[in-house]
Amino acid sequence: MSEYLEYQNAIEGKTMANKKTFKQAPLPFIGQKRMFLKHVEIVLNKHIDGEGEGWTIVDVFGGSGLLSHTAKQLKPKATVIYNDFDGYAERLNHIDDINRLRQIIFNCLHGIIPKNGRLSKEIKEEIINKINDFKGYKDLNCLASWLLFSGQQVGSVEALFAKDFWNCVRQSDYPTAEGYLDGIEVISESFHKLIPRYQNQDKVLLLLDPPYLCTRQESYKQATYFDLIDFLRLINLTKPPYIFFSSTKSEFIRYLNYMQESKTDNWRAFENYKRIVVKASASKDGIYEDNMIYKF
């Protein structure tokens, strides 16, 4: 097969015929890396032969599980470990309740508040009452995406209720997540316990998408679990092969440059890494760069 056709197959996700391939996470999650999927696919297909037999792919900061799903779809014989530190798999179990609450809120606003329009105090109070009265599962990330202005994040229902509300309610139900985590081992533990278990094993790929240092982390279940010390610890634990994500809103690339110049601890792990840059936008911060670096 020509290199061009291999590239096209990677982009189009043709490796798992007759199985649904998710190109975005089933439920909202800030920073789910969907803009990088085609690049992840190309890198995996280039460096891991066939269906990945004998490989272990560890999604260390699992987030939405989208990277784990993508890896398993492309390399079905690899062992894929999804470290679900944010409880995303539990959220997927409650999509029916999430859709019921979405419909209740949608019905309250439809025809009264225009899409993206601000809610009055009276209507906001009505929506809060509907949420409080709802007996099923209440998904904070979904509520924030429906009722807060683009990209805003909160860490609690109380923080949500303190914000201005906007009609950003999704127009249709979320699809089921059937098959999303099929064949994937779901765990939940700290990265500094997880990574060392695989450090002396061959054919282990680390997928590293930590909360970005120096940025707001409210969308993560444990908002303060990744700080400067954790960042430095992660850098020292990292060894090739890996795929590592960062943003220019943090100073990750600058730090890697410093490591190379100063020959600090573990600098060789990042020597001659390759970098892919994707332009991204945020409602408040304008255009910024997301980075994917990798080394095999």
From Swiss-Prot:
One of its GO terms (molecular function) is methyltransferase activity. Disulfide bonds: none annotated. PROSITE patterns: N6_MTASE. Belongs to the N(4)/N(6)-methyltransferase family. It comes from Haemophilus influenzae (strain ATCC 51907 / DSM 11121 / KW20 / Rd). Its EC number is 2.1.1.-. This is Putative methyltransferase HI_1523. It is an enzyme of class 2 (transferase). Keywords: Methyltransferase, Transferase. GO terms for biological process: methylation. It comes from the Bacteria.
